[in-house]
Structure formats: C-alpha cells, structure tokens
Amino acid sequence: MMEILRGSPALSAFRINKLLARFQAARLPVHNIYAEYVHFADLNAPLNDDEHAQLERLLKYGPALASHAPQGKLLLVTPRPGTISPWSSKATDIAHNCGLQQVNRLERGVAYYIEAGTLTNEQWQQVTAELHDRMMETVFFALDDAEQLFAHHQPTPVTSVDLLGQGRQALIDANLRLGLALAEDEIDYLQDAFTKLGRNPNDIELYMFAQANSEHCRHKIFNADWVIDGEQQPKSLFKMIKNTFETTPDHVLSAYKDNAAVMEGSEVGRYFADHETGRYDFHQEPAHILMKVETHNHPTAISPWPGAATGSGGEIRDEGATGRGAKPKAGLVGFSVSNLRIPGFEQPWEEDFGKPERIVTALDIMTEGPLGGAAFNNEFGRPALNGYFRTYEEKVNSHNGEELRGYHKPIMLAGGIGNIRADHVQKGEINVGAKLVVLGGPAMNIGLGGGAASSMASGQSDADLDFASVQRDNPEMERRCQEVIDRCWQLGDANPILFIHDVGAGGLSNAMPELVSDGGRGGKFELREILSDEPGMSPLEIWCNESQERYVLAVAADQLPLFDELCKRERAPYAVIGEATEELHLSLHDRHFDNQPIDLPLDVLLGKTPKMTRDVQTLKAKGDALAREGITIADAVKRVLHLPTVAEKTFLVTIGDRSVTGMVARDQMVGPWQVPVANCAVTTASLDSYYGEAMAIGERAPVALLDFAASARLAVGEALTNIAATQIGDIKRIKLSANWMAAAGHPGEDAGLYEAVKAVGEELCPALGLTIPVGKDSMSMKTRWQEGNEEREMTSPLSLVISAFARVEDVRHTITPQLSTEDNALLLIDLGKGNNALGATALAQVYRQLGDKPADVRDVAQLKGFYDAIQALVAQRKLLAYHDRSDGGLLVTLAEMAFAGHCGIDADIATLGDDRLAALFNEELGAVIQVRAADREAVESVLAQHGLADCVHYVGQAVSGDRFVITANGQTVFSESRTTLRVWWAETTWQMQRLRDNPECADQEHQAKSNDADPGLNVKLSFDINEDVAAPYIATGARPKVAVLREQGVNSHVEMAAAFHRAGFDAIDVHMSDLLTGRTGLEDFHALVACGGFSYGDVLGAGEGWAKSILFNDRVRDEFATFFHRPQTLALGVCNGCQMMSNLRELIPGSELWPRFVRNTSDRFEARFSLVEVTQSPSLLLQGMVGSQMPIAVSHGEGRVEVRDAAHLAALESKGLVALRYVDNFGKVTETYPANPNGSPNGITAVTTESGRVTIMMPHPERVFRTVSNSWHPENWGEDGPWMRIFRNARKQLG
C-alpha cells in the first residue's frame, strides 16, 4: 500500500525566476510555477497514530518556506520507475534506523503546478522537457500514478541465441540488438568457440564477452600491431609506454597490473583506531603512494551530473581496490568541452556549429558536470585539489584539411592519490574455496553497456541504449564500503581481504571473471544471492548492470565472521555470491529457474581474441601562419583573459571541499585574497609529519592539430613545470599518469597517436628519468549528426593529459604565485629559447586561427636542468614566488601572479625579441620566478650551473599599487589597472555562477573582486598561539576519554580525533551503530564530539536524519540525555555534527534558543577559507580567545542560521549564546557573500548553551589545527595553528 505525504516547497524564489525566464526565452506562456516535494511511502503494514506522526516528523526537513494550496496543472517529476534513487535508499535507511520497519521504501518526487495560457501538446512537451532529466526521471500527471514506482515484476529467464540453427547471422542480429559493438573477427571467434562447445550461447554470455573485450576494457588499440605508411612498426603503443618503466623502475612498487599504480612514500605516523578498543593512535610505518587517473567521457556527454559523479566515484573505487585494500586521499578533476556560448556573454570566437540531439551542450556539461564530480568527492570525504578546464571548438585547417575540431564528446577526467600499507601493495593468493563477495549496494537496472557504449563514437548507438548506459551515484554508500576496507587494511596481517577489484564497466560480468582469473582460479556463482532491488530483472540485467559503489572481493572462508562483523558495524551491505574453484571455469546458477545462464571455460571469455592490426597513413598538417592585422595587444589581453581555459576557475573550485582530512597543505586558492592559481596540489603524508604528496596536471591538446608529438611533449613538460614548485628532490621521484584521448580511425589521427606515444614513451620520458606506471585511453572521441541535410562530425584533437605525482620532502616549502612587494626581481626562464611560437595558442584561438608552428620541448637537457635548478632554489629558500608559463603566455603568468599578490607589475620585455605580441603570448615552456633583489646574482648563478644561462631574462619587478605596466626600451607596450584585468579574468566565473547559483551571491562576489582596498585575510589573536594551556594537565598522565561520534556518511572523524589526541585526550571511535546495538554506551566518556560530513548524504535535512535516529530510539535517546545532563562533561558539534545537535534541543539543557541550520543562500555547497571572530559567550571551548579574528575552513551546503523570527534572533543575541561570527577582511561582521558563505543573519556561525558546556559550530577547526593545513597563514606561525587552542581548552576544562 502507498501513502502520500506532502513536503515543503522545493524551489527557492530565484530558482523559480530562472525557470520562468527559460520558459519566456522559449516563448512559452507560463506565468507562474509552484513546486513542492511529495513523499511516497510503500508500506508493508498500516502505521498506528504514533508511527504516523513519527513518519510525518521524519519527512519535515529543510528551510521553513511558506507553502500554499497549489493551483495550476500538475506535473509530477519522480525517478524513473524500475530505478531506486539515492535519496530513496538513504531515506529508507533512516526510517528503519528510527524503528519504522513497516516502511518498505520511501521515494520522493517534485510536484510542479504550472499556471499558463493555452499551450499546445507540443508546448506542454517542451515544458515537461525543461522540468526533468529524461535520463533519470519521468513525469506523471496525477499523484496516484507514483504507485508505478513500487510495482514489482516477475523475474524473467535467460534467453539464448540460436547460433547452431541460424549460424553467423544470429550473432550479427544479437550484436545490434544488445549494442555489443563486436568486431567482425570477434563474431567469427564466438561462432567458432560455441560451435566447439556444441551449444547455443545465452544472451548473458555474449554480453559478458562484449564487455570484457570492449575497447574500454581491453585497450585493443594500445595492444595492436602497427603498420604505418606500409612499414611494420617494432612496438605496440603499450610497449612504448612500458619502456618508461623498463628505463626508470626506481621507486615504483606496482605498475600496469592493478587498479592503480603504487610508488614509495615516506615513513610517517598513520593515524587510526584499534579494532578491539576503538582507541585512536599513530602507527609509524611507510605510507606508500598510489595514483590513478580515469576518464568518464561518454556518460558525461549524455547526463553530466551522474556522468561526472560516477566518474569520480569509479576512480575512488579503483584506489580503494588497489592491492589488498587502500585509502583514497585527494582528487583531481578535468574537463575539455566545446565552446560555452554563455547567453549574453558570447565571445567573438564562438560559432555555433550544431550538435547531435542526444548529447547536451558544453554549457550544460560545465554547469552540471563539475557539480556532480564535486558532490561525489564532497560526500565521500575526499578533497578535490587540482584540475584543468579547456574549451575548444573551431573549423581549422589541420592534418586532414579543413574540418570541425572540438569536444562535443567531452573529456571528463577524474584522478587522485591515496596511501597503502607496504604489506598490502601486492594482491594475495585466492585459495580454492575462498568466498567471493560483492560489497556495496544492490543491483539495479541501470548503466547497462557502459563499456561497449563508451567504445563507440557518440551518435552511432541507439538513443535508448545511451539511456541504459547512464549510471547513478550514491557516494555515501561508497563511503561505507571504504570504511569497511579501511577496517580491513588497519588489521595488518589479519586483513581478511585476499583480493579486491572495483565494479565498473560491465558490472559483475566483468569484475567477477577478472577477480578469479587474476587470482589464477575459476568461480561458481549463484545469481539469486546478488543483492537486488528489482526482482523483475533478467539474469543479464542482474549480472551485467553497472550499479555503482560496489567492489568484488575474495575472503578466506574462516575470515568471513570477522568480515561480517565489520560490515554490520559500518552498515555496508554485502553478499557472498560464490566461491573460487580449482578448475578455470565460470558457472552461474539461477536457482529461481534452476538453470545455468553461464557455463563457460574462462579462456573462451578472456582468451586470446584476435589481435588487432592498425594499418594507417601519416598526414602532415598544413597550418596557415597567424594573420596579425587588426590584432592589438590591448584587445588580445581582454580576449585571452575571457578564454575559459585561461580565465578564473573559482566556479569550479569553491563547490569542492578542499580541507577534509586535515592533511591538505596546498589547495588551488592562494594567499590572503584566495586566488585560484596554485601550480600544484600538496597533501601531508600524515597528521604528524611534514612529508607529503604532490600532484599536478599538464595538457596542451590544441597543439596536436599542428604537431602530434609536440603536443605530447608539452603535456609532460607542463606537468613538470607545475609540480616543480614544491620540494621533491630527485626527478625520478615523479611518476606520471598518461590519459590518451583520440578519434581512432579518423584520417591521420592513428599515425599521429603512434608518433605522440613514441615521443613520450621512447624518447622524452626515458631521457628525463620519468616513468609512466599508469594511464588510460579513450579512443572514440568523435560525434556525428545530421544538421539540416548535411552530415556533420566534430572530432576532438588528439588529447594527452599528463598527471604528475610525487613524494614531497617538506610540504612547508611549496612555492605559490603570490608576489611579494619587498625589494625584488622577476626572472623569466624561457625554455623556448626565444622561439616564441604562436601556433595553437590561446591568442590564436581567440582570433579564430590555428597558426602554423607551435611551441615544443626545445632542449630536453635544459628541461631537466630547469627542474633540478628550481629544486635547488626551493631547498635553499631562494624563491619568493613561482608560476609556470602556460595557456595565455607570459602576460597571463604575470597577471595571475599580480592577482595573487594584490600588487602591481613593472615589467620590461626588451630582451625577449622585437615581436612584442609573440613575446607576451607565446606558450613555450618556462616559468617566472620572483627572488629578493639581493639574491638575484646567486640565483642566476644556480640557473647557469644547470645550463640555463641563455634562458634567463630579467623582466622587471613587483611593486605595490594597482598598475600593471609592460615596457620595452622605454616605450609602453601595455598598461592597465590590475583591478581591471582581475575583473576581466573573473567575468567567465561570474557569468557561470550567475547561471548556476543564486545570481545575487554571484554579483556580490564579483563586486568584491573590484575592491583594490581589500586588505585580504588577516589575523588578530587575543592569546599566545604557542602557549599550550593543556600542558600541566597532560603532565598528570591522565587522558580523559572523548567519544568521536560518527554516523554513516560522516567523513571528518579522523582529523577530529587527532586534534583531541594532541590536546591530551584518549580519542575513541564510536559509530552510531555501536550505540544503537548497545555495544558501547556514553557513561565512560567525559567529552563527546559529533563530526562533520554527510550523514545519510544529507537526505531528510542535513544532520536531521542522524538526530531523529537518536530521538526516535528510546534507549539511545536516554543515553544522550543522561550525558548532556551530567555535570563535568563537554560536547562539541562541528558541521554535520552541529546540524545534528541543533536538532537535539529537547535533550540539551540551555539550548532552547538554538537556531536550525538550513540551505545556504547561494543554494550551493560552499568550500571557503573564511574569516571569523570569537565573540563573548559562555562557551568553555573558546575561553581566553574572545576578540580573536582568524581564518577557518568552511565546507557545507546547509549552514545558514534560521531563526523563527526577529524576537528569536534578539533573544539568542541578548543571552550571549553566539560564539563565532563571520567577518569581512576589514573585521566587520558581515552578511555579504562570500565573506559570509551561507547568508546567516548577523554572521552567526557558532552557538553555545547557557552553561557553555556544549558548543556547536559550522566551520571546521579540526581541519586547520596544524598551521600547515591552512590555505594561507602568517609566516610566523609554528606547528600549531590558533584553532588548536579550543581542543586544549577542552582538556583544561576537564582538569
């Protein structure tokens, strides 16, 4: 039976206005829209009055918006029937954890009530199309129609393909019907194999074969034999990549054989809790570094949010599934798309060339895709610290004559680093009889055919198959699985995981055969043991769907009880679906129909299918020299600063958490003005050391339109000039991931790919001492469509993205582009040796040209000398600032340095050649360094010792003030106000934020950038930062116990425990499941801290589901009430813990006036480094800190203080319960965005009780308790940041 419960309004006023504006633009006479959430409860038994009231209370969440009786025509948007939304899974979990077992499932829809003039059927279809994503959602016209969401269908049996009766044609038909993308020789192979077995294949077997052998999974092109211009080539592409490892195997522990590569890390204290006691402690051991970079291009073109989200999610799983289990740590992301053409902000180089119907626009991709990728990382709890963004779309004269080149099929790059224990780097042995386990969520009818679909050019497959290959994301489920993996690796030798893979393309049909065959075993499986939410799925759908957030593992039979205990505690679902066999055979039994859908020798599935040969021709690019008439430097500057590749990326940065883990030493945002220009990302290896890891990206794809090999060399060179800015030491410590994107089969591209791989694998990397132990290829980068009567195609440039990873010696010595105005000199190190080539530059692109000669690595020895010289200068502390030269050339390098330093530039380019345009806009490799004037000679001498004497040019100095001036021989070449340039550079991000977020907030942030008087972040402390007020209490040897409380989806508990640990506490890991099952109580604890993250993925209101699981459970409710009423206890709630505790007002004495915390005014997750002041309040944690003003990490989507009315706010203020407020850089309490990131009244961001024993705050002190984890800090801070004081105050209060 289904029950319908009304919810709160679903759209804020500005969202409704945006929708109305879209309807107006489409000439649809819609005058009003009202939208509210509707909840549907599928019940297995009726609820009594109390239970009904409880369910209603559970479904009351979010900001208090006025709802009203709806008018107009109803359009109900719900998830597609036959799928279960992530919202539903989490909301149902909450209902069950609150004791409502009668609820089978909760689902949510949005009811839109449309008031409009007379609309035709076609117009109603347009309205409907605007209101839902057809890939994920459906539209009903009555609330009762939602019954279809809970319809259950009968299981369907396996079907077979009549090969023996109909011969080869049966396979050809099945290939088309199932979208298998099989090649002719593969059809021959299958015909032969099944004829020998003497039986017809089942659809599931063919599907499984297609997935396992798709280009996506098998990398046929990279393993192919090559004939170029009639000549047989000696090596495959993959062999040339492997050559880098054969030449330089140094520091690599695992390459080419696992889900990620592993290199040596540093010996540090890894901090985690003991399995038996729950007590956190440091464990001194090597933290080896794993690295992985994936692409998720096809799904992102079809449905950008889930496409990018599951791209990040899949890459995170790859990291977790390395060796015998590992820990993902920090991420990077990248996008290449066609031109944005932002409405009202179209740029002179952006022409509309059309696109296929079924893929979305570049603007849609860049609006939704980055949000999806960021949301997954945020909710999983992984900081996203690095990225790139390129737009390109043009008709150019390239290798194949004049044609359209661009990224209608986008690149969505997702990568990252993690850590792994030394004894878990290699996979274990799978013994016969080992249990084969699926860890993670249930099977669902989604993502069918992702592997085969992404191996086709976009526009070739059937639109319905495209629908089927879109996946959905549930990061909070993946977090639970990762917690299980963490518990396993933390057990060291007792780790129950023998072997682990993630489930990706092809679902279990790919993952399980890979798991057993990699372990040298076969497997026998039972189909009906697989967790499934949809009983009507066919065997093919159950076995082959790509439901996300799943891993496959082999666990020794005797370890299963331990594994079961770990999963139950973390509430991570799992199923034992089979066991490993001696015989290398794969069998899948279906007990419902008592038949065998799969019964195959493993070698038929994974055997040597025919090897591909690529027989290709070389084409030479024509390229026309840059036509320069009409190009002035002033116009070029403005255009280039508007090119998205060059322009400010804030809209891509602040949506992603950059502080979670407490181990981020360098994020994108640099300096007191938080400008996104960092050269590389840096994390600390642990919470107790200065060792670390760095990552950086290099890519220069447009150059491939002129010279394939140069483009590949530049990508390596740029990654190197980016990562050089931190203290790494020997270049052999740097390892690269190479991600290759190409339109295989397009004239000239295959030979070009071979040339590019050879340039990097056989020549450049071996010469530099660099290794490529990991990478990926995507070989179908082309879209085709019909535009009127014309066939069109858009082909991407050959695109190599290089991600560089390295161990860092000391994270404190990372140099940023932030200029200083002390007596200084700016030096350009020009690795282009004066070539100043303008082909395929940002300058060429903004004038709709390609040019003829591009930049290149001019001298490999000098590139190596450059890296070594910068490392020497970093180690000698001789660099004040550093920024590499890249897109936009020297002009952009200097401008970005000036933006970060909020200063002027007085530059002189006389020595850079007579062609001023080329001197300023060429994109040859190199960097600008800033040194003290007194050190200039010494620095030039170090550069000369490394063979760079002829590359070094003095180009002027940074000066205080607002003028950005470039001269040559006394003549002014260019002069502008730095503020004006800063505003031009910011206009793209402003326009994107206006479109995507609350436009008022976007306007406020943009306006703040034009204030030259802004002093930037600054610190005023009312206490001595170096005084340890806890020292006398720590000296007693007594360590009070603090319960570090987490719920499923919480992700900030480890750094919280570390902060309390440093202050003299015994930090104990307490999961809500421990309290609900009675394994642990709160009576032994002196302090309690509720940590940040996304409990239940913020479903049913941030922190509200967590709070209700306490309030609606009598025993746990009493446990908390007793704790809060016990004198001599302290409690802290941070972020999600703050939201949760604000909902426990009825249990916490003195908290009656606390507000609620709801959706930010920007309607967006905000990750900022914000200035707050400590106000006079009873809070015991903030004693002795009143009047201090200091920055703190902020990361939340629902942090806005909501009070009932003005009287409530006045009472909260007059009682003195406000503990922290946001202030602007002038020290004034603010409600202006983004200094106040969530729009809270009076800047309120922390409150306390009347006794001061319980304090709750939205910002994250635990993520910045170490100086090194602050995005910016004054030079004179030592190891401890000022926020360490609150943890020491806690220790002092407990005596």
UniProtKB/Swiss-Prot annotation:
Alphabetical list of SMART domains matching this protein = GATase_5
Top EC class for this record: ligase
The subcellular location is: Cytoplasm
Query: What is stated about pH in the biophysicochemical properties?
Result: Optimum pH is 7.2 with only 50% of this activity retains at pH 6.2 or 8.0.
Which InterPro entries does the protein's record reference?
A: Class_I_gatase-like, FGAR-AT_N, FGAR-AT_PurM_N-like, PurL_large, PurL_linker, PurM-like_C_dom, PurM-like_C_sf, PurM-like_N_sf
| Residues forming the catalytic site | C1135, H1260, E1262
Q: Hey, which pathway is this one from? A: Purine metabolism; IMP biosynthesis via de novo pathway; 5-amino-1-(5-phospho-D-ribosyl)imidazole from N(2)-formyl-N(1)-(5-phospho-D-ribosyl)glycinamide: step 1/2
Enzyme Commission number(s) of this protein: 6.3.5.3
Where on the tree of life does the source sit, at the highest rank?
A: Bacteria
Q: Name one GO molecular function term.
A: ATP hydrolysis activity
Q: Which reaction does it catalyse?
A: N(2)-formyl-N(1)-(5-phospho-beta-D-ribosyl)glycinamide + L-glutamine + ATP + H2O = 2-formamido-N(1)-(5-O-phospho-beta-D-ribosyl)acetamidine + L-glutamate + ADP + phosphate + H(+)
Protein residues bound to ATP: G307, A308, A309, T310, G311, S312, G313, G314, E315, I316, R317, D318, A678, S886
Where the record annotates domain Glutamine amidotransferase type-1, the positions are: 1042-1295
Binding residues annotated for Mg(2+), in chain numbering: E718, N722, D884
Q: Where is this region: Disordered?
A: 305-327
Task: Indicate yes or no for the key word Nucleotide-binding.
Answer: yes
The principal localisation class reads cytoplasm
Q: Which Pfam families match?
A: AIRS_C, FGAR-AT_linker, FGAR-AT_N, FGAR-AT_PurM_N-like, GATase_5
**Annotated S-S bridges:** none
Mod. after translation: Both N-terminus methionine truncation and retention have been observed for this protein.
What are the GO cellular component annotations? cytoplasm; cytosol
Give the UniProt keywords, A-Z: ATP-binding, Cytoplasm, Glutamine amidotransferase, Ligase, Magnesium, Metal-binding, Nucleotide-binding, Purine biosynthesis
Task: Report the family membership.
Answer: In the N-terminal section; belongs to the FGAMS family.
Quaternary form?
Answer: Monomer.
What's this chain's function?
Phosphoribosylformylglycinamidine synthase involved in the purines biosynthetic pathway. Catalyzes the ATP-dependent conversion of formylglycinamide ribonucleotide (FGAR) and glutamine to yield formylglycinamidine ribonucleotide (FGAM) and glutamate.
Protein name (Swiss-Prot/TrEMBL): Phosphoribosylformylglycinamidine synthase
Tell me what gene encodes this.
purL
